[in-house]
Amino acid sequence: MNMTEYDQAIIALYEHPGNNCAKPSNIAGAMLKTSLTNVDRNTSFTVTWSLPDFSAQAVLSCSINAHAHETAVIINFERGAIKIPSPIFCPKEFIVQRHGQVMQEERKSYEYTGGGWHFQADEVARCLRDGKRESSLWGHDKSLLQMEIFDEVTLGLSILEHAIEIIVGSSSGRLFATLRS
């Protein structure tokens, strides 16, 4: 699974002031694997926050064999949308569209050299220089949450694959299984 689309969801939803950095209430996913290496080729997953004061959902997908759409990220809100063009790992602009009787659009563009990874390297260098063990921009909580989400998606899929193998090998034709939700 790719991490870049996850980053946008965390910035928009996990860090949203109304969420107060609460973990998602539900994670679901689907994956197609390559026949050659059995690694994920296409993965889609949904991360849902369903809290009394904050409800939001991220629908994410990544692929190693299909090109990204021109608009890599669309974040819809009640009063507008933020659109981030491809490539998702190195966007050089974003567009804010406000909904209303006359839709307003604001475009912000940035110029920099490289593929975008230097931002992470610069942050690591700043942390090392300052003696920090954790970045204030992307703390351990976000990395651990990412691992939990990815584990949940892959665990759910491996349980499903195992259940399918049992069905194929079953002589009684009946299977009762409980999948963790």
Residue ranges and their predicted role:
Residues 102-106:
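Surface-exposed loop/edge segments in extracytoplasmic proteins
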